[in-house]
UniProtKB/Swiss-Prot annotation:
Superkingdom assignment: Bacteria
Keyword Lyase: no
Extra remark: The Rieske iron-sulfur protein is a high potential 2Fe-2S protein.
First-listed, main subcellular location of the protein, grouped into a coarse class: membrane
Cofactor(s) the record lists: [2Fe-2S] cluster
Positions contributing to [2Fe-2S] cluster binding: C107, H109, C125, H128
Chain's role: Component of the cytochrome b6-f complex, which mediates electron transfer between photosystem II (PSII) and photosystem I (PSI), cyclic electron flow around PSI, and state transitions.
Membrane-spanning segments: 20-42
Disulfide pattern: C112-C127
Membrane topology, from the record: Single-pass membrane protein
Name of this protein: Cytochrome b6-f complex iron-sulfur subunit
Residues of the Rieske domain: 71-161
Length: 178
């Protein structure tokens, strides 16, 4: 057998080319399949420039501050759809203004929606009896943690809900939900 001169030998063989093509295709498919998974765990922020999501009422309509305050008296705690569609309490302060924080209504024990009991002035979970004070701090188990907080902002009369990442003012700890 005669040996070919170095200038006649191709730099990449057919097998090497097919291996690179197969690897490139598999990598593209894997990255394409991982995008929805990554987007699920790290969703893009929805909403305006403040990064907030517009609160929605039980019919899915955007909540406005003037409309909400005209129908809800001081001290009222009523549910809206907040972050990720979770039920979130909007609190009407004594000075006829919407409070600067909201309370996520999902119980930290087993995920039931916790109703506000105005007679007892606390949230009482119907599933296993966990109780939370007026600010959502756990006062009686079996729930291990306080209810999650959200920021409430008013922008051009729209009520915006955004993630609470600062220290939890009720406990002085880092927020467990952030």
């Amino acid at each position: 057998m005669t040996q070919m001169s170095p200038s006649d030998v191709p730099s990449m063989g057919r097998r090497q080319f097919m291996n690179l093509l197969t690897f490139g295709t598999a990598t593209g498919v894997a990255l394409g399949a991982l995008y929805p998974v990554a987007n699920f765990f790290m969703p893009l922020r929805a909403g305006g420039g403040t990064g907030g999501t517009t609160a929605k009422d039980e019919l899915g309509n955007a909540v406005t501050a003037t409309g909400w305050l005209s129908n809800h008296p001081a001290g009222d705690r009523s549910l809206v759809q907040g972050l990720k569609g979770d039920p979130t309490y909007l609190i009407v302060d004594g000075d006829a203004a919407i409070g600067n924080f909201g309370i996520n209504a999902i119980c930290t024990h087993l995920g039931c929606v916790v109703p506000w009991n105005s007679g007892a002035n606390k949230y009482i979970c119907p599933c296993h009896g966990s109780q939370y004070d007026a600010n959502g701090k756990v006062v009686r188990g079996p729930a291990p943690l306080s209810l999650a907080l959200t920021h409430i902002d008013i922008d051009d009369d729209n009520v915006l809900v955004s993630q609470w990442t600062e220290t939890d003012f009720r406990t002085g700890d880092k927020p467990w939900w952030a």
